[in-house]
Amino acid sequence: MTEKSHKKTAKGRAGSPSPTSARNKKADNGARGNKVSERLKAVKELQKTETKKARPEHVVNLIGDALWLMGLAATLYLAISLISFDMGDPSWSHSSPVVEDVANWGGLFGAYVADVGYYLFGWSFWWWIAAACVVLYKNFRLHAKQTENEAYNHKIAAAALFVLTVFSPVLEYFVLGGKYADSLPVGAGGMVGIRVGAVFAWLLGKSGSLLIILVVLLLSLSLLVQISWLEFLNGAGRAVQNRLSALSGKVMALGKRRPNTKTDGVDTQNTRRMVKEAKNITAKPVALPEGSSSNRKSVAVSVAPPPKIQVSLFEDDEPRQAGEYHKPTLNLLRIPDSEPVSINPAELERTAELIESKLAEFGIGVQVVSATSGPVITRYEIEPAQGVKGSQIVALSKDLARSMSLQSVRIVETIAGKNTMGIELPNDKRQDVMLSEILSSPVFAEAKSKLTVALGKDIAGTPVVGDLAKMPHLLVAGMTGSGKSVGVNGMIMSMLFKATPDEVRFIMIDPKMLELSIYDGIPHLLCPVVTDMREAGQALNWCVAEMEKRYRLLSHAGVRNLEGFNQKVEAAKAAGKPLLNPFSLNPDEPEPLEKLPLIVVVIDELADLMMTERKAVEQQIARLAQKARAAGIHMIVATQRPSVDVVTGLIKANIPTRMAFTVQSKIDSRTILDQMGADELLKYGDSLFLQPGSAEPTRLQGAFVSDDEVHQVVNYVKSQAPADYIEGLLSGEAALETANIVNPNADSDELFDQAVAYVLESKKTSISSLQRQLRIGYNRAANLMEALENAGVVSSTDLNGSRKILAHKDHL
C-alpha cells in the first residue's frame, strides 16, 4: 500500500512540472523562435543578394541608361512647358474659354503643369529645372566613372530643393511683389511667396527677412550643387592673385629691365613664369573612397607637393663691369611643362589590397598603413603580422613582382624611425625630373657650398642636393641606359651654376671621348678634357703633387683646411700685409700667396682607366681619396662595370659616398652599396644614394639635363671668360715643377742630377742599373730612385715591379 502511494506521488510530481521548469521551457521556446526568425531573415537577404548577383551587369547598365534618359526627357518637357506658358490656355488656377488649339508646347498636360507650378511658386518654380539638371549631370558623371569621389547624395539634394522652393518665392515676392500679374497666375512669388512672405514680414520685418532668406538660399544652393563656397571663393581668389601677379611682373619687366642686360643667379623673368605655373598647381588633400572591401584601416596617402621656386625679388640694376664673370642663369635650362602626375586614391587603395592579398597567398600576413607617391615610384608601408620575419617578405620580391605583373618590386626591410617595412612599386605614369626644378628650389639656392650638386628628387618628390665638400668623394655606378652619365652631367652643371672659375676648377678624364668632351674649353678647366689614358696618369700625378704642395702651405699657414687658408690670405691682403710664398722658386723675391680654388676631378669611366694604367691609377686615386679633402681636392668617379677588379677594396674603402643607378646583378649591387637593391631599379635616373655613416640608401630620381641644355650653358660660360690651362700638366712638366716645390731637398744628393740624366737617356728605371752606373751602394741607389719618384721623373712600381718614365729629356 505504501509502495503504491509512493509511485503515485512520484508520477504526480513527474506529470505536473514546477513553475521554474515552465519558465525555462518558455525561455527556450522564445530563443528558438528568435533563432528561426534570424535564419529566415538571413535566407531572405541571401536570396536578395543572389538575385542581384544573378542579374547580368549589362542589364543593370541598360536600366540605368533608360532611367537617365527618361529623367532627361521629363526635364526637357517641363522646361518647354514653362517657357511656352500662356495665360489663355486651359488651366487649374482660373477659368478660361474652351479652345481647340493650346498655345503651350507641352500640350494640355503641359499647360496644367506650368499653371500649377507658377501658381504655387512663381518664377522660383524654375529651381526644379535647375535641380533636375544638377542631378542628371552628377549621375551621368558617376555612371561614366569620370569621378572618384563619393556618389551624389540625393536625399540632401531633395532637402535643399524643398528649402529653395519655400524661401526663393518669398525673396521673389519681396523684390518683385505686385509685378508680372499679367504673366503669372497670382504674380511674382506665387501663393507660397505671398503667404510665407506675410509671416516673415510680420515676424522679422522686410530687411531682416531678406538677410535670413539670402543666407538660407546660399546654404541650400551649396547643398544642392554639393560644393563649398569657401573653396569656391578661395579658388577665385587664387585666380585673381595669379592674374595680378602676372600683370605686375610684366609691368616690372617693362619698367626695370634693360636691353642686353643679364643678372647673376636666377633669371627673374623666367622664374616668375615658373612661380606662376607652380601656383596654378595646388596640392589638395587626397580623399580615399570609403567602404573598402577590406576590413583594414584606410591607407594614409602622401602626395608629392609641387616644386617651390626660389625667386629673386629685385632685379640687379647695376651695370656690368668689363671682364667680370657672371654665372649662368636658369633661362638657359628647359622649364618642365608637365604638371605633377595626379594621384588616384582609389587606385592606391586597390593596389594596397592587392599587396595584402598577394602576400597572403604566400602565407604572409601584412597590413598596408600608408602610401607615399613620388615622381616615379610609390612606397607602401606595411606592418607585418606577429611572428612574420622581414627576411621572409624580402625573399618574395621577385614573386610579388611577377604576381602583380610589374617590372620589379623593391622591398625596404627597415625604415628609419618607424616599425614598418616598405614596398616600392613603379607608377603607371613616369614624371620627368628636370635639372631646372632642382636648381630653382630653395634647398639649392640657400646652399652656401660652391660644390653643391643636384642629385634629384626623393621618394616624396622633395628636391635633394649634396655637398661634395662633405662627401668628400663620390663613387657612381650604373649600366648603360641607367642614367649614370646624365647624373654626372647634372652634378657638373650644378657646380657651373654655383661657382666661378676662381672658386672651382675641374680636371675631367673621359676615356669614351663622348660624355665630358662637350666641356672642353670652359674657363673652369685646368687642362683640356683628357681622352688619352697615358695623359690621365700624368693628370693624377699632378693632383697628388698639388695635394702635397697645398698641405705644406696649410701647415706653414697654421690652418687645417683650404677654407681657413683662403680666409687667412684674404684677411692679410685686406690688412695690407699679404702672405708670401715660403716655397717660391725665387726665395729672394717671393711672390704673394693667392686664394686657391677647389679642384674637382671627374673620371667618367674608371674601368677603362684601370685596364690601361691599373697600378698607378689605383694608387693615385687611393692617395687622393685618403688625404685630398683638407687640400680642397675632390673626386667624382663613375663606372658602368662596378666589379671587384674595377672598384677595388683600396678605392672603395676611401670613398664612402656612393650613388648606384641600375646595375646588372646583385653582385654589382653589393660591390657598390654593400647591399642588394641596385639591380631592382627602373633605369632612366632611378638611383640609390648612400651617404657616409648611413646604413640604408635613399632612393632618388635623378635630374635630367639634355645635350641642348648642356651646350647652351657651356657656350654661355665660354663667352664669359677664356680657357686658362696649366701648361705642361698632361706632359709631366707641371708635376715635376710642383714636386720640386713640395720636396726641395729631393736633389740634396750630389748624384741626383746624374741619376736624372742617366734615367732619361738610358730609359732604364731599375735600382740595380742605377747602382752599377753610378757605382754606389744599393741603399743609396734606392734613395735616389725614391727621390726621382717624388720629383715626378719616374712613376711608382707596377705589379711587375717596373717603373715608367714620366719626364722628358727636355726637362734637363
From Swiss-Prot:
Protein name as annotated: DNA translocase FtsK 1
PROSITE patterns: FTSK
Residue numbers on the Cytoplasmic membrane side: 231-812
Family as reported in the entry's similarity comment: Belongs to the FtsK/SpoIIIE/SftA family.
Single GO biological process annotation from the record: cell division
InterPro entries: FtsK/SpoIIIE/SftA (IPR050206), FtsK_4TM (IPR025199), FtsK_alpha (IPR041027), FtsK_dom (IPR002543), Ftsk_gamma (IPR018541), P-loop_NTPase (IPR027417), WH-like_DNA-bd_sf (IPR036388), WH_DNA-bd_sf (IPR036390)
SMART domains: Ftsk_gamma (SM00843)
Species the sequence originates in: Neisseria meningitidis serogroup B (strain ATCC BAA-335 / MC58)
Residue span of region Disordered: 1-36
Domain FtsK: 461-670
Biased composition (Basic and acidic residues): 25-36
Subunit structure: Homohexamer. Forms a ring that surrounds DNA.
Residues binding ATP: G481, S482, G483, K484, S485, V486
Subcellular location: Cell inner membrane
Any GO molecular function: DNA translocase activity
GO CC annotations on file: plasma membrane
Function recorded in the entry: Essential cell division protein that coordinates cell division and chromosome segregation. The N-terminus is involved in assembly of the cell-division machinery. The C-terminus functions as a DNA motor that moves dsDNA in an ATP-dependent manner towards the dif recombination site, which is located within the replication terminus region. Translocation stops specifically at Xer-dif sites, where FtsK interacts with the Xer recombinase, allowing activation of chromosome unlinking by recombination. FtsK orienting polar sequences (KOPS) guide the direction of DNA translocation.
Topology with respect to the bilayer: Multi-pass membrane protein
Record field: transmembrane: 63-83, 116-136, 156-176, 184-204, 210-230
Keywords: ATP-binding, Cell cycle, Cell division, Cell inner membrane, Cell membrane, Chromosome partition, DNA-binding, Membrane, Nucleotide-binding, Transmembrane, Transmembrane helix
Domain notes: Consists of an N-terminal domain, which is sufficient for the localization to the septal ring and is required for cell division, followed by a linker domain, and a C-terminal domain, which forms the translocation motor involved in chromosome segregation. The C-terminal domain can be further subdivided into alpha, beta and gamma subdomains. The alpha and beta subdomains multimerise to produce a hexameric ring, contain the nucleotide binding motif and form the DNA pump.
UniProt biased composition (Basic residues): 1-11
